């Protein structure tokens, strides 16, 4: 028979694995629906600040837990045509990666700048960086760098982010240097 402590650890492990499976399932469903056109992006004029805030709310706890300082520079009154739900999903995926790969005590910054022809949303962090040879690959479905297999993930978040941004007429890229 199991002790109470063993039972608690066992249940905690089951919950953790269930959460991972749920995350994978949800990511695959979202990707599939987006790719097959089941979900149509619904671009409307809306405040980008609210979309950024929604994405940020999903990573605040994990960032605090690692002691990562998070800052946002986004004009509150900036309105643009975008699908706020899916844009928030794309931004969350970028931020989630930033939290995963930024060491404890690091920094993550989100800045939003209105240019003449487009709006730039930039996520910067003090993470380990991505080698130039891997930069194009990180947006492929299921791609994961060899060195990051200790981190939780399935390699779908950045692919989904790229799909969402591209389907709204946007462009996503990475600028990084290892270290």
Region locations from a protein language model:
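Short beta-strand/loop element within the Bergerat-fold HATPase_c
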Residues: 105-117
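Short helix N-cap motif at coil->helix boundaries in the Bergerat
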Residues: 48, 129-140
